[in-house]
Amino acid sequence: MQTYLVGGAVRDALLGLKVVDKDWMVVGATPEQMLAQGYEQVGSDFPVFLHPKTKQEYALARTERKSGKGYTGFICYSAPDVTLEQDLMRRDLTINAIAQEKDGRLIDPYNGQQDLDNKILRHVSPAFVEDPLRVLRVARFSARFAHLGFTIAPETIALMQEMVVAGELEALTPERVWKEWEKSLSTENPEVFLTVLRQCGALKVVMPEIDALFGVPQPAQWHPEIDCGIHTLMVAKQAAELSPNKVIRFAAQVHDLGKALSPKDDLPSHKMHCKDGLKPIKALCQRLRVPNDYRDTALMVCAQHTKIHHANEMRPATFVNILDQIDSWRKPERVIQLALCCRADARGRTGHENDAYLQADILLAAFDAAQQVDVKPIVAAGFKGKDIKEQLAIHRTAAVELAIKPLQSKA
């Protein structure tokens, strides 16, 4: 019975990155032997055990054979005669197929270290095509390691394209698609996840609402990049630079879905995209079972972002109306979410990446002033019911006017 550290822990250590989780592989053991040593079995599909003290995962070496469509159609074989090399062969990428012995010696039968040195994401074997989830995983790894200069091997991209054409991705469940997308939102370059999916044709399958933006023109006067899809990728990049918050990053990626629905006769204008975008956002979130906080923030940004772009000339009462609409009094975090997404939107344009965005400062100043208005004096003055709400709006509008006037004069 031999134990090896495998997968991401070995890879990240070799890259000089922080190792978060450690996964172990056990060769030459049976489930009975593991249980006898105090390990707790947790895997139902294949033998995985938790260490009695560290609670880290220990999996018995196994092989996998395709038995059906999708990512669940596998027959797993786990026995003491399965070798280390056989287990590593079933893994997706060479950089994830390196094992380490307790003394630190590396076992690297598929040249993962060489690919790490050359910054290449390359599949281990032709069996890569048997699991459609790997298309999304490679896209996510590409997003995670893009800042280090990693690229995908041409032959791996070719396999991913073949899998898309073969219809393999249609077997993916909504939960698995969302899980990979959500993980990509935590990477250094979330826009690369979408770029890779677009490159291999998968974006049209798993996120057709985003894919539909590519090729749709915008006015060159405001959008030198012209293409709505390119703009979306640029906004996604800007949002990632502005905030680590996954909800904000998601909202930025889907805020312009309505532009794909603009009438062709109106192009390159998109006058109704803020309203038109609500339906595809709802459809996308329902299909992929996106959590409600992601969905609601995305809908808010979609509905309001064009208004905020005109904050320089917006009337105080309009600010108060918007703050009411987004439920900012109960959910103050929405104001900063909206401000950051709008800043990302404004900067997600060719040549405007470093523009100042005073509109965000005006919005935040308006909210800060309105929030400080106390309702108690209004109630004490004898107002009741709807009259309280009306008076509160009047007082908030007056406070907002004082707060934003100096900022608007700078615009």
Curated annotation (Swiss-Prot):
Xref: InterPro entries: CCA_bact (IPR012006), HD/PDEase_dom (IPR003607), HD_domain (IPR006674), NT_sf (IPR043519), PolA_pol_head_dom (IPR002646), PolyA_RNA-bd (IPR032828), tRNA_CCA-adding_enzyme (IPR050124)
Cofactor: how and how many bound: Magnesium is required for nucleotidyltransferase activity.
Residues binding CTP: G8, R11, R91, R137, R140
Pfam family, one: PolyA_pol
EC number assigned by the record: 2.7.7.72, 3.1.3.-, 3.1.4.-
Residues involved in ATP binding: G8, R11, R91, R137, R140
GO molecular function: ATP binding; CCA tRNA nucleotidyltransferase activity; cyclic-nucleotide phosphodiesterase activity; magnesium ion binding; phosphatase activity; tRNA binding
Entry superkingdom: Bacteria
Keyword tags: ATP-binding, Hydrolase, Magnesium, Metal-binding, Multifunctional enzyme, Nickel, Nucleotide-binding, Nucleotidyltransferase, RNA repair, RNA-binding, Transferase, tRNA processing
GO BP of this protein: RNA repair; tRNA 3'-terminal CCA addition
Reactions the enzyme catalyzes: a tRNA precursor + 2 CTP + ATP = a tRNA with a 3' CCA end + 3 diphosphate; a tRNA with a 3' CCA end + 2 CTP + ATP = a tRNA with a 3' CCACCA end + 3 diphosphate
Annotated family: Belongs to the tRNA nucleotidyltransferase/poly(A) polymerase family. Bacterial CCA-adding enzyme type 1 subfamily.
Subunit structure: Monomer. Can also form homodimers and oligomers.
Function: Catalyzes the addition and repair of the essential 3'-terminal CCA sequence in tRNAs without using a nucleic acid template. Adds these three nucleotides in the order of C, C, and A to the tRNA nucleotide-73, using CTP and ATP as substrates and producing inorganic pyrophosphate. tRNA 3'-terminal CCA addition is required both for tRNA processing and repair. Also involved in tRNA surveillance by mediating tandem CCA addition to generate a CCACCA at the 3' terminus of unstable tRNAs. While stable tRNAs receive only 3'-terminal CCA, unstable tRNAs are marked with CCACCA and rapidly degraded.
Protein name (record): Multifunctional CCA protein
